């Protein structure tokens, strides 16, 4: 029944809206949830769906930060316009590693790592990394506390960290936030740049998935279009809340709690995978 499929779409949109911005892996969570709750659709659509619904989350970022990211915003001084263009240049530079590395390898990683065990391992490994890095940085003052002071070189290396998220379970936001902190930025700068970098990255990735879907000879029927729209709209609404939560959270807290969550979830998934294999 279509109504059941739409309810599932709403649920997946909620998962996407929350996990896209928290450093816990949205694609990984969607793949895991679909182990238990699946859309009654073909595999090609589901694989495309998992990526394309990110567009709703991206539009939420664009809405929240529209004035900050718009160089043509009325009332901006010449200096503010210059800084906005510089920010966009940093974002473009940070996209280069993904274009050169992640895009060509995407199909290979999709074929070999989109399974529960690799996702569980990635959750645990990056969970440990979050805890360890936060512990190492506890007594250190960040060198970069303002995006305007972040160098183009730092932006490029943050983009290199983003490439790590090609492995499901890693988390794009988690990889870039970790990388930014390692490179000396404050948590606030790390989170903000992660949000901004998501715009071209996820628009591009979603576009590639959609184009590949159609080039492979697939098409969308009315029900599938509706499922995509409902899931994306839900992801948009939930993302508005998740982004505001994270921007306030990082001002007073570190990311240790997310590291612990990743380790617990990854461990449970390994146990589940073991029993599923045995029994």
Swiss-Prot record:
Main location: membrane
Claim: Transport is one of the keywords in the record: no
Transmembrane regions: 2-22, 44-64, 85-105, 113-133, 163-183, 188-208, 223-243, 255-275
Ribosomal protein recorded as keyword: no
Membrane topology term: Multi-pass membrane protein
GO MF annotation list: undecaprenyl-diphosphatase activity
Catalytic activity: di-trans,octa-cis-undecaprenyl diphosphate + H2O = di-trans,octa-cis-undecaprenyl phosphate + phosphate + H(+)
A Pfam family of this chain: BacA
Domain of life of the source: Bacteria
EC number: 3.6.1.27
Keyword terms of this UniProt record: Antibiotic resistance, Cell membrane, Cell shape, Cell wall biogenesis/degradation, Hydrolase, Membrane, Peptidoglycan synthesis, Transmembrane, Transmembrane helix
NCBIfam families per record: PRK00281.1-5 (NF001391)
Extra information: Bacitracin is thought to be involved in the inhibition of peptidoglycan synthesis by sequestering undecaprenyl diphosphate, thereby reducing the pool of lipid carrier available.
Summary of the function given for this chain in its UniProt record: Catalyzes the dephosphorylation of undecaprenyl diphosphate (UPP). Confers resistance to bacitracin.
Protein name: Undecaprenyl-diphosphatase
Gene source species: Streptococcus pyogenes serotype M12 (strain MGAS2096)
Gene: uppP
């Amino acid at each position: 029944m279509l109504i059941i499929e739409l309810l599932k779409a709403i649920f997946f949109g909620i998962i996407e809206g929350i996990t896209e911005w928290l450093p816990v892996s949205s694609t990984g969570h969607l793949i895991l949830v679909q182990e238990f709750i699946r859309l009654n659709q073909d595999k090609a659509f589901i694989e495309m769906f998992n990526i394309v619904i990110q567009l709703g989350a991206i539009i939420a970022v664009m809405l929240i930060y529209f004035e900050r990211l718009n160089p043509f915003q009325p009332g901006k001084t010449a200096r503010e316009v210059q800084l906005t263009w510089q920010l966009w240049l940093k974002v473009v530079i940070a996209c280069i590693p993904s274009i050169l590395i992640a895009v060509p390898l995407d199909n290979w990683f999709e074929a070999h790592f989109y399974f529960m065990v690799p996702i569980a391992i990635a959750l645990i490994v990056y969970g440990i990394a979050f805890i360890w890095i936060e512990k190492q940085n506890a007594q250190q003052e960040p060198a970069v506390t303002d995006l305007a002071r972040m160098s183009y070189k730092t932006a490029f290396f943050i983009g290199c960290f983003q490439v790590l998220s090609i492995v499901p379970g890693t988390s794009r936001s988690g990889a870039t936030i970790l990388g930014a902190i390692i490179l000396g930025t404050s948590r606030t700068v790390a989170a903000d740049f992660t949000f901004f970098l998501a715009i071209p990255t996820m628009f591009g990735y979603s576009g590639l998935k959609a184009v590949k879907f159609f080039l492979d000879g697939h098409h969308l029927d009315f029900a599938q279009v509706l499922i995509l729209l409902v899931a994306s709209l839900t992801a948009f609404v939930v993302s508005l809340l998740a982004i505001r939560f994270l921007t306030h959270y990082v001002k007073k807290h570190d990311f240790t709690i997310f590291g612990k969550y990743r380790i617990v979830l990854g461990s449970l998934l390994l146990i589940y995978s073991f029993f599923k294999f045995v029994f």
